[in-house]
């Protein structure tokens, strides 16, 4: 009886070790499809995750939260924000072999109202987002020229406008 229990325990430990090793191998081989930069606004997070899933990313991306996304990168009041973002992109590239950065702005953004007050209409705000996304994307390309930068804006009705991609 003792011998059978020991054999079963040994088999269980071997099986657990094998599962653990397989899990570790999966973790080592993990490549993320993208590095997603989203705003901290809680109203849009679920819709952004749903959009990324719909586009085939599931949750296979690294995520970074930055108030205002593009304006958060471009504003000068808190220069450490962009510095920290660029450091995280480099880490993601090194660890998870990302090939793309996705900048996901949204309209009705408090950071835009804080750093760029004065727009009066949805279209004025949208135009400002497009302008700031271009500047932010160019900054990212200057730091990591081998990565694509995809820029998009979520509208009030939760539709997503894919603005442009820098290759």
Located regions from the model:
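A short beta-strand-loop structural module common to alpha/beta enzyme folds
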Residues: 59-69
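Short, ordered loop/turn segments at secondary-structure junctions
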Residues: 106-108
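Divalent-metal-activated hydrolytic enzyme cores
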Residues: 3-48, 67-83, 91-100, 110-167
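Short Gly/aromatic-enriched secondary-structure transition segments
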Residues: 49-56
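A short, polar/charged loop/turn motif at coil->beta-strand junctions and beta-hairpin connectors
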Residues: 30, 57-60
